[in-house]
A protein has these predicted regions:
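Residues that define the transmembrane beta-barrel architecture of outer-membrane proteins
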Residues: 1, 65-69, 111-115, 163-167
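Juxtamembrane/interface motifs at transmembrane-helix termini
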Residues: 36-37, 107, 149-151
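Gram-negative outer-membrane beta-barrel transporters
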Residues: 1-100
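Feature captures outer-membrane beta-barrel proteins of Gram-negative bacteria and organelles
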Residues: 69-71, 75, 117-119, 169
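C-terminal beta-signal and adjacent terminal beta-strands/loops
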Residues: 91-101, 120-175
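Outer-membrane beta-barrel pore domains
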Residues: 57, 111, 173-175
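Short, glycine/charged-rich beta-strand-loop motifs at protein surfaces that mediate ligand recognition
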Residues: 102-108, 116-120
Length: 175
């Protein structure tokens, strides 16, 4: 299910709303990429020729949220010195796994929320000055980490899939 709406609510102002409901599950998937009994303990292998093969049938696909929503507002205000452009967006995703394994606190996030905003003055002489904040809700820099399980030979890691909060000023001049 996808819903996309854009509304012009005033001179130079638009509101965008996007919503998706995604029911992405494996019909059949025998994961024989490793011996999964090291992670899950004893179970019946889905492939008799591959010890520790694990059936993911009916499981949700990784990196696919169940619900996704984006709300954004943009405004352009012409002035004597140039345009002032203001933008803000909020993104919400629910029940998202960052891998095939859904482990609470490691590879599964109940929600991922992102807030971005910026204000830009685009001067008539080709210079622009922009103040911005991206991923402003991630104060602890901990959004969307995932765990890679160690193999029998060792390894394992944490991976971050989204950048942390960034804020700053940017000046651009076009020659």
């Amino acid at each position: 299910l996808d819903l996309n709406m854009t509304a012009r609510v005033g001179m130079g102002t638009t509101i965008n709303f996007d919503y998706s409901y995604i029911d992405a599950q494996y019909d059949s998937y025998c994961d024989d990429s490793r011996d999964w009994s090291e992670v899950h303990g004893t179970f019946t292998a889905c492939n008799p020729n591959s010890a520790g093969s694990y059936s993911r049938a009916g499981g949700s696909m990784p990196w696919t949220p169940e619900q996704s929503m984006i709300l954004s507002v943009n405004h352009v205000q012409p002035t004597n010195i140039g345009d002032v452009v203001i933008g803000a967006s909020y993104s919400y995703k629910s029940d998202i796994a960052l891998g095939d394994e859904r482990v609470e606190g490691l590879t599964f996030n109940d929600t991922i929320e992102r807030l971005n905003f910026s204000t830009t003055i685009e001067f008539n002489n080709g210079t622009s000055l922009r103040g911005f904040c991206t991923n402003c809700l991630d104060e602890k820099d901990d959004i969307a980490f995932s765990l890679i399980y160690p193999q029998s030979q060792g390894g394992g890691a944490r991976i971050k899939y989204y950048p942390g909060m960034r804020a700053g000023l940017e000046v651009i001049h076009k020659f």
